[in-house]
Regions:
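PPIase-associated folding chaperone regions across multiple families
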Residues: 12-21, 25-57, 105, 154-232, ...
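N-terminal targeting/tethering segments
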Residues: 24-165
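A mature extracytoplasmic/lumenal domain signature
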Residues: 67, 74-76, 133, 216-221, ...
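Soluble non-cytosolic domains of exported or imported proteins
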Residues: 69-73, 95-116, 128-132, 167-176, ...
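Sec/Tat-exported extracytoplasmic proteins
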Residues: 79, 83-86, 108, 112-116, ...
């Protein structure tokens, strides 16, 4: 999974770091489903070069994956940072363990293959940025980022993140294109949108799901150890009955929900609840829901929470795109799609001579850790020997 470097490099007010979601509005996200002129990857990188320049290492190709150049800056960023992470968390001698070396190599391969695939797919499918998106989410965001670091921002990024300014911007472009590829495939009108809707609809139908909205009129809270009084229960019933009468008289059910519903979970389920008989809803709620026909409204249904007024709704493909099941199916399908596309990409041999400086840089860091470790051990041994000698003299 890609992570935006703009977020990981962003300082909080107390000098730390924070994860920042890169949110774009739906109108902009859907730009790639229309025929408007967009800034595609190659044009975006020309604009990046105009803004921050490009070092030789930013253009130096060390291998090709799927016909896409992997540059030295790109390879170095992952190789050096991953080496440091492995050394910091698994020990300076991690390279002596085959399983760790295999994990390291797999992580490098996955990162480079993913970035190459993003470039390849965005080129093939014409996925890019509107001018406003590019100016706001890339260029202006970059300006805001480096403003936090002052005049020495370039050296700071190099020292802390092992990254050039050119590749920093390229990485952010790739991160946002990754999200846009997903939107291109799964937003309404996307290549895989109808397939995922059908998969989700089939799942609901095959597993006997219902969809309902409800109005909960809650019992009043009672202090621990006390019980709800008959008077409190009657007052709640009367209020719920008045709302039920409004619903049966034809008043808009959604408007009644907005006005009277006391279910805290309703806000995160605006299109209703989808469930089958294995769900954790109370049995009375489930029984009443399954007894209804589509469009029918229940009588008052009592549970430990209060009184429910339930309306059963149809399960159709227009609404299921907002369900957790649709999202889960989309994510699973996207993973499969990415894995399949990665498997199709051919790779040229890595030019090991060209990347040797990055390897040396990573090894230098590991050697520093080893030296610090050895010096600490030596100091401990010397202290122990001195303590032993002093103990003998004391005797």
């Amino acid at each position: 999974m890609l992570v935006t470097l703009f977020a990981s490099c962003t300082k909080t007010e107390n000098g730390g770091e924070t994860d920042v979601e890169n949110n774009e509005n739906t109108e902009n996200n859907e730009a790639n489903l229309s025929s408007g002129e967009l800034i595609l990857f190659d044009e975006a990188m020309k604009l990046v070069e105009e803004k921050v320049g490009a070092k030789e290492e930013d253009k130096l190709s060390v291998m090709k994956i799927g016909g896409v150049d992997v540059t030295y800056s790109q390879y170095r960023y992952y190789y050096v940072n991953y080496s440091k992470n492995f050394a910091n968390y698994s020990g300076y001698d991690w390279q002596n363990y085959d399983d760790l070396v295999e994990s390291f190599n797999s992580a490098i391969d996955e990162a480079l293959e993913m970035e190459s695939l993003i470039v390849k797919l965005s080129r093939e499918k014409g996925i890019g940025f509107t001018e406003e998106e590019f100016d706001t989410n890339i260029m202006s965001a970059y300006d805001s980022l480096i403003e936090q670091y002052g005049d020495d921002y370039e050296a700071t990024f190099e020292e802390n993140y092992n990254i050039t300014q050119y590749y920093l911007l390229e990485n952010e472009i790739l991160y946002q294109l990754y999200n846009k590829i997903q939107q291109y495939l799964y937003l309404e009108g996307g290549e895989r949108f109808d397939d995922i809707k059908k998969t989700t609809l089939d799942f609901f139908n095959d597993n006997n799901y219902v969809r309902v909205k409800h109005i909960l009129v809650s019992f009043p809270e009672v202090t621990e150890g006390e019980e709800l009084t008959e008077e409190q229960k009657a007052e709640t019933y009367t209020k719920a009955k008045e709302i039920l009468d409004k619903a049966n008289a034809g008043e808009d059910f959604d408007e009644l929900i907005d006005e009277f519903n006391e279910d805290p979970g309703a806000a995160s389920n605006p299109d209703g609840y989808y469930f089958n008989d294995t769900s954790t809803f109370t049995q009375a709620f489930k029984d009443a829901s399954f007894a209804l026909k589509e469009g029918e409204i229940s009588d008052l249904v009592e549970s430990s929470y209060g009184y429910h007024i339930i309306k059963r709704l149809p399960i159709d493909d227009e609404d299921i795109v907002y369900t957790n099941e649709y999202y889960d199916n989309m994510i699973e399908d996207f993973r499969d799609f990415i894995a399949e596309e990665r498997g199709k990409m051919e790779k040229t041999e890595l030019d090991e001579a060209l990347v040797q400086p990055a390897v040396d840089e990573a090894n230098a860091y590991i050697n520093e850790l080893k030296q610090a470790h050895d010096e600490a051990i030596a100091a401990e041994e010397a202290e122990a020997a001195e303590d032993a000698e002093n103990a003998e003299e004391a005797e």
